[in-house]
């Protein structure tokens, strides 16, 4: 099945499926209208002389036309390449060259972006002419393993890698999950170049749900959208919900969140304290800890015997997916180790990177790089990134484990642990702490708590208190920047007590 044919799965194509709040007033669009625009775009690509397999890039924020390109390129048998608008220009230029783009589509805010490929700006006269033509008569026939999407990693630890997702990779996930979502009103505020936002949209359009699309996240707009459109399902990262909570406290009677039935938290480790905060924000909702990788799309599902889900569990092995935990050092399977995934959702590989493919793919198994624990009931829990692990005096330290311990302190709102170089022990753990509002703490308070509640070798040797934690372009904690900050602070001998 072609990705674009997911639109044909919608049981009520004439009903409103998209409320596009990137425009004022927000237009309401049906799947039938989206489908027509998708086929017009597909035919326009053919008329431009582009052939199946050609890479079509999109550098844009959230707007309704995003879906035209997202579905339209694959509808013509071409490959959709979403570009992260938060990446520096040099990185974007690298991606454009690496992907060998044949056409770049941008929104107005990126109209001045210079690239050595043909470019069309959404809303321009050229775009209008292109979208004023006749629709393609049909969707291009594809093989299950034909590439549909080439989405790039953030490149936080090197050059971005192009993840090759086939039509089957994506349609498999949508068809597995979509049956449970008819009638849902989904709030999409994360960038559509991220997997979670684009996948949520595909699920809604295929199942008969509705997408309320925000141009970008802002806590006030987020709350307004929930209230105005009676949103039933939303997702976000922990920092988003912290901002939403603060915004709600300014005018608690202005917003009605009672319509929300499902809340998914993802892209960062979840503590029980944060879980409780989000549950208090949406008291009628089922709050779940979400997990997903760009490379594997689908991993977890409910318990096969319908056991109640522990607060911060990621779920159990999905019935259409194989999971195993592999010890990174010995290669043996156990109840604690690196998560490996095998399913129809696992990527074809990284574009042009044979060495990376050999490291991450083994006989169809994708090595996620995420350390997990599985309990006796089959529930999986996130422990940390294998790559984030560091060694202090011969002892392996997983930052997430130390952070979870520190965040159990009643005065700690958020903790991030990173290593710094040390001549004697190799690396030492350090911590950046966000305290609860109005609380005064000292570095010694944190160190003493860590020594009492965890192994001595893992306690942070240096502690700094900060107002906010830097985020990378993926909205995840920017550990690389924090390591630089820690080393700078130590070199200047400016540890904050």
Spans of model-derived segments:
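Conserved structural elements of the adenylate-forming
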Residues: 34-41, 144, 163-183, 189, ...
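Conserved AMP-binding A3 loop
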Residues: 28-32, 148-172
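AMP-binding/adenylate-forming catalytic core of the ANL superfamily
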Residues: 87, 104, 234, 343, ...
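Conserved pre-ATP/AMP-binding loop-to-beta segment of ANL
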Residues: 12-16, 134-152, 159, 180-185
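AMP-binding/adenylate-forming catalytic domain of the ANL superfamily
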Residues: 455-476, 495-497
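Gly/Ser/Thr-rich phosphate-binding loop
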Residues: 206, 231-236, 249-309, 322
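Conserved AMP-binding/adenylation subdomain of ANL enzymes
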Residues: 171-185, 193-233, 247
């Amino acid at each position: 099945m072609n990705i674009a044919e997911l639109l044909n799965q919608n049981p009520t194509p004439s009903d409103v499926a998209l409320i596009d709040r990137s425009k004022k007033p927000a237009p309401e669009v049906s799947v039938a209208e989206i489908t027509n625009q998708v086929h017009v775009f597909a035919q326009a690509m053919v008329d431009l002389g582009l052939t199946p397999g050609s890479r079509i890039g999109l550098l844009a924020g959230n707007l309704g036309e995003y879906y035209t390109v997202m579905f339209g390129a694959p509808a013509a048998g071409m490959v959709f390449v979403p570009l992260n608008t938060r990446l520096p220009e040099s990185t974007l230029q690298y991606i454009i060259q690496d992907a060998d783009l044949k056409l770049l589509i941008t929104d107005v805010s990126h109209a001045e972006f210079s690239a050595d490929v043909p470019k069309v700006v959404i809303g321009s006269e050229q775009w209008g002419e292109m979208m004023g033509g006749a629709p393609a008569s049909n969707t291009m026939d594809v093989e299950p393993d034909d590439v549909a999407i080439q989405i790039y990693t953030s490149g936080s630890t090197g050059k971005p890698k192009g993840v090759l997702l086939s039509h089957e990779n994506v349609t498999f996930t949508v068809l597995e999950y979509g049956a449970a979502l008819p009638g849902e009103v989904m709030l999409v505020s994360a960038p559509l170049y991220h997997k979670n936002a684009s996948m949520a949209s595909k699920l809604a359009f295929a199942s008969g749900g509705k997408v309320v699309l925000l141009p970008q996240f802002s806590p006030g707009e987020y709350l307004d959208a929930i209230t105005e459109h009676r949103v039933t399902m939303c997702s976000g990262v922990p920092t988003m919900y912290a901002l939403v909570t603060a915004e709600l406290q300014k005018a608690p009677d202005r917003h009605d969140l009672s319509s929300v039935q499902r809340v998914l938290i993802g892209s960062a480790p979840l503590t029980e304290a944060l879980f409780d905060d989000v549950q208090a924000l949406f008291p009628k909702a089922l709050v779940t800890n979400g997990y997903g990788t760009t490379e594997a799309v689908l991993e977890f599902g409910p318990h096969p015997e319908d056991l109640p889900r522990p607060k911060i569990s990621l779920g159990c092995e999905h019935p259409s997916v194989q999971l195993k935990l592999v010890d990174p050092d010995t290669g043996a399977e156990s109840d604690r180790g690196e998560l490996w995934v095998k399913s129809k959702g696992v990527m074809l590989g990284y574009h042009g990177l044979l060495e990376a493919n050999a490291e991450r793919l083994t006989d169809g198994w994708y090595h996620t790089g995420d350390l997990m624990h599985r309990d006796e009931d089959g529930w999986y829990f996130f422990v940390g990134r294998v790559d984030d692990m560091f060694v202090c005096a011969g002892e392996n330290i997983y930052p997430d484990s130390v952070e979870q311990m520190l965040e159990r302190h009643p005065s700690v709102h958020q903790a991030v642990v990173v290593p710094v170089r040390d001549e004697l022990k190799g690396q030492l753990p350090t911590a950046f702490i966000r305290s609860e509002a109005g609380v005064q703490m000292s570095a010694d308070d944190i160190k003493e708590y860590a020594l009492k509640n965890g192994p001595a070798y893992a306690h942070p040797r240096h502690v700094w208190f900060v107002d906010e934690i830097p985020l990378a372009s993926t909205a995840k904690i920017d550990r690389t920047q924090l390591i630089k900050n820690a080393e700078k602070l130590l070199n200047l001998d400016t540890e904050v007590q």
